[in-house]
Amino acid sequence: MLNVNIICVGKLKEKYWTMAVAEYEKRLKGYCRFKITEVNEERLPDNPSDAEISSTLEKEGQRIIKNIGKGAAVAALCIEGKIISSEELAGFIDKTALGGVSEIDFIIGGSWGLSKQVKDTAVLKLSMSRMTFPHQLARVMLCEQIYRGFQISTGGKYHK
């Protein structure tokens, strides 16, 4: 069974986000081994300097990279990523699994994004939209899209 992980910066703070993610975790059990790993978010002042932002991205990036599985296919969510359809995401998951890779790690950065080092590990740079969303909502949306991808691949009725 395929291992699918989300490695993200920060914790879900509101119960409604936690409940939404828990629902998709439950739904995904029949399709993959699903896990979410939260790495600590760096604290920054209200108006951080470029150097402070760069340092934050580097520290968070190191924490993320430590959690990427050996041989995993990495998909990083980033602003410059490619916008793809749900069907294309299903195809990425299928192609990765059929290619002999046993793990896909999806990466969600913190408020300032991802370090170049993290982005460079990615086989897919993915954008949810040209719009900006809170990272907590992006996590829920990604969980839903992963579930939808498995439904598409298996001919489930969830995707219309």
Model-derived features with residue positions:
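Structured adenosyl-cofactor binding patch, chiefly the S-adenosyl-L-methionine
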Residues: 112, 116-160
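N-terminal beta1-alpha1 ligand-phosphate binding loop
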Residues: 1-28
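General small-molecule cofactor/ligand-binding pocket signal
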Residues: 7, 35-37
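Conserved beta-strand scaffold positions in the cores of enzyme catalytic domains, especially
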Residues: 36, 74-76, 125
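Short glycine-rich anion-binding loops that position phosphate/pyrophosphate groups of nucleotides
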Residues: 12, 79-82, 110-113
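Short, well-ordered alpha-helix to beta-strand connector turns
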Residues: 32, 71-72, 122
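Loop/turn-to-beta-strand initiation segments
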Residues: 3, 102-106
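S-adenosyl-L-methionine/SAH cofactor-binding core of RNA-modifying enzymes
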Residues: 40-102
